[in-house]
Amino acid sequence: MKALLHKILYRTLPLEGYLRAVSRLFFISYRLGLGRRSAATEYVYHLPRLAKAGDTAIDIGANLGYYARPLSEIVGTAGRVHAVEPVPVVRRVLRRNLRGCRNVEIFDCALGAENKEITMSNDSARETGYLGTGRNFVGDAAGEGAVTFTARMRRGSELFAGLERLDFVK
């Protein structure tokens, strides 16, 4: 049923609208406590055991904010969340999903071994019929029907050189 809904949304909405709808459904499910036994979403429910108030966290590949938003609530006003998301359309939805999370900073890059422009691709629609969020990869070998994005890659050691502490990395 979930896959059918994803296919319908992906085929009828523009990409950003699809991502907004999918993320809205996730956050509703999360608030209701659904998905605890789903392989795709179970880990977000473990965050309160891994992070605490006042922590500094980095969310690498923040995607639509499925971890950054709960982390923002957990670390509270004394903590900080650094969300790294290189894909522009995904980052726009991430910003929307993190409205009001004053302790989150969003970085518009991927993390890697060097500072350079990269191509990221997602060819999950070929296999599933819809774009699987969180399935973007770096490389020029995108298959037929792949969605591609240009992004910046930055060295994490440089990007986060000024952090005084780091308590949690996803």
Please place each PLM-identified region on the residue numbering.
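Phosphate/nucleotide-binding beta-alpha loop and adjacent structural elements of enzyme active sites
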Residues: 1-170
